[in-house]
Structures are given as structure tokens and as C-alpha cells.
């Protein structure tokens, strides 16, 4: 299991650099998570594991070389293609078609539409043998912009990177007769909720059978000061507020209650406290419904 885990991590790192966001705000929001991570670090002895993973290893070098070959020859062009053909969450049919066709061509059996999600899929290595199962998560949805969908969060690269890692590790297992297998999980709509796709897939039992699941995400940083888990993301909370009013014609507005005015005050009040927030804090919002006619409150 450790060997397959090491190969999986090495393959992902060969295709992209990973870094952690570490700020006082994140640490305060994730105290309990950090405590658990600290206990896990002590159990695993991350420094020793890092030294082992970065030591000379012929098998790992073969895997990383294969990752580079796949990326340079085939998967970077796929990433560029997905970038130029963005699809928002739960409509990523073209991206999924590209990713799954490539997996099928490299000895993976694909099941599409898992957990009732049209653009979710599971791809299992058909040459795998009983043993540890390395899971690789890929995402491929685009952001929603005022001028249409666009890729601004590296999801166009994440799929190809994950495929390179999964295929390189799978080929290594077969070539060296190492027990184990690889499963790729295609998870849609990461930028668009609800539904929370990974939660839906988890509740449906899609991830059962995986011994460990890894995922990569592109970043501009190429190194960290020390080995360790760190905190990987800001604490994210999604909140939906609904304001209720009473309709009235604008000429007799005093007979109604203008819910839209309350919504605008909410946004203004949030803006008024931004100057006191730490620079890494982000609060964003959108008005999904603000009335049907301008002459009705």
C-alpha cells in the first residue's frame, strides 16, 4: 500500500506543483482539523516519509518519466482543448467525453452517470489485481462569467494531470507485477452548488473500495519551506439568505415592504467591514432574484 501511495503522490507531483495556503485566519477556522492533521503527522513521521519519497527510487523515476511523456505528448494538448471549450458544472459533456475516451484507450473501464449525475464517472483499471486501490479524483467544470463560461481555476488542467498520474501508476503495477489497482473518479460541478457532487457520490457509495484518494490542483508556488500537510484551503461556508417583503405599486410604496432594499443593505454592510478583514478573507455574493418589475416594490 505504501508503495502505491508513494507512486501516486510522485505521479501527481510530477505533473504539477502543490502548495498549501497557511494564514492565521485559516488556522483559527480549522483548529480541530489541524489538531487531527498534527496527530496524523506524528503517526506517519512525515519528515522521514518525505525523505524516503525523495530518495533515489528507480520505480518512482520510471513513473514520473512516464507522466512527463504523457503530459508532453498528449495531455497538455487535451488541457488546452478543455480550456478553449469551457462547460459549467453538470454540463461538462465534452470534457467528460475527452477524459473517458482517453482512459478507455489506456485499459480503464468507464461507468458514466454514476450517483445520478450525468457528468460524473468512475474509471477502473481493467488490468488491476487484488490489493490496495489508489483513487484519483479529477474535476473539469468551468467558472461562470458575465460573458460566458471560462476556465480560471485550473480545472481544465486537473483532469489531464490526474489521468497522467493514474495511467502511469497503473502501468507500473502491471509491468512490475505489483498487487493493486487504480480508480479514477470524475466529479462534476465543483464550482457550482447545489448539489454537492462529491457528497452525493459519497452517499451513493461511489468511493467505496478506495484505500486512499488523491487529487491535484495547480498553483503558482513551486515549493514549501518544510514537509508536512499544512492547510490546503480556506474555510468555505455557503450561505443563502431569503428576504420576504410585501408587494405594492410604486405610487403607494408605503403599503408594502421592499425586500430588495434589505438585500442591498446586506451587501452594503458587508462592504463596510471589508477594511477590517484580513487580506486572505473573501466574501462574495450574488442576487439570484430581485423582483419582476421596476414599478412594484
Locate each region found by the language model:
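Alpha-helical transmembrane segments and their juxtamembrane interfaces
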Residues: 12-13, 165, 193
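A short, glycine/Asx- and small/polar-enriched loop/turn
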Residues: 127-132, 235, 296-297
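Histidine/acidic-residue-rich, glycine-tolerant segments that coordinate divalent metal ions
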Residues: 144-152, 156-157, 176-296
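Positively charged n-region of N-terminal signal peptides that target proteins for export
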Residues: 1-4
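Acidic/His- and Gly-rich active-site-bordering loop/insert found
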Residues: 24-152, 156-183
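Boundary at the C-terminal end of the N-terminal hydrophobic targeting segment
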Residues: 17-22
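A short, polar/charged loop/turn motif at coil->beta-strand junctions and beta-hairpin connectors
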Residues: 7, 76, 117, 130, ...
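Bacterial N-terminal signal peptides
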Residues: 7-15
Amino acid at each position: 500500500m505504501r508503495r502505491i501511495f508513494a507512486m501516486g503522490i510522485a505521479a501527481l507531483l510530477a505533473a504539477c506543483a502543490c502548495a498549501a495556503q497557511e494564514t492565521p485566519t485559516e488556522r483559527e477556522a480549522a483548529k480541530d482539523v489541524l489538531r487531527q492533521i498534527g496527530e496524523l503527522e506524528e503517526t506517519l513521521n512525515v519528515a522521514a516519509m518525505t525523505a524516503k519519497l525523495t530518495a533515489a527510487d528507480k520505480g518512482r523515476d520510471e513513473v514520473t518519466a512516464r507522466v512527463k511523456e504523457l503530459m508532453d505528448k498528449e495531455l497538455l494538448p487535451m488541457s488546452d482543448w478543455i480550456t478553449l471549450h469551457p462547460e459549467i458544472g453538470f454540463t461538462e459533456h465534452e470534457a467528460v467525453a475527452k477524459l473517458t475516451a482517453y482512459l478507455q484507450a489506456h485499459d480503464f473501464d468507464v461507468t458514466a452517470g454514476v450517483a445520478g449525475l450525468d457528468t460524473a464517472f468512475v474509471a477502473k483499471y481493467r488490468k488491476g489485481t487484488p490489493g490496495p486501490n489508489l483513487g484519483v479524483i479529477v474535476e473539469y467544470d468551468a467558472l461562470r462569467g458575465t460573458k460566458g463560461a471560462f476556465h480560471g481555476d485550473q480545472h481544465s488542467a486537473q483532469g489531464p494531470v490526474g489521468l497522467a498520474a493514474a495511467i502511469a501508476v497503473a502501468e507500473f503495477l502491471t509491468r512490475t507485477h505489483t498487487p493493486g489497482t487504480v480508480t479514477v473518479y470524475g466529479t462534476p460541478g465543483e464550482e457550482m452548488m447545489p448539489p454537492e457532487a462529491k457528497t452525493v457520490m459519497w452517499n451513493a457509495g461511489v468511493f467505496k473500495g478506495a484505500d486512499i484518494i488523491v487529487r491535484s490542483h495547480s498553483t503558482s508556488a513551486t515549493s514549501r519551506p518544510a514537509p508536512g500537510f499544512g492547510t490546503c484551503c480556506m474555510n468555505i461556508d455557503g450561505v443563502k439568505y431569503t428576504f420576504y417583503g410585501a408587494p405594492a405599486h410604486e405610487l403607494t410604496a408605503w403599503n408594502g415592504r421592499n425586500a430588495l432594499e434589505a438585500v442591498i443593505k446586506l451587501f452594503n454592510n458587508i462592504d463596510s467591514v471589508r477594511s477590517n478583514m484580513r487580506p486572505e478573507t473573501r466574501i462574495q455574493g450574488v442576487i439570484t432574484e430581485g423582483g419582476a418589475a421596476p414599478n412594484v416594490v
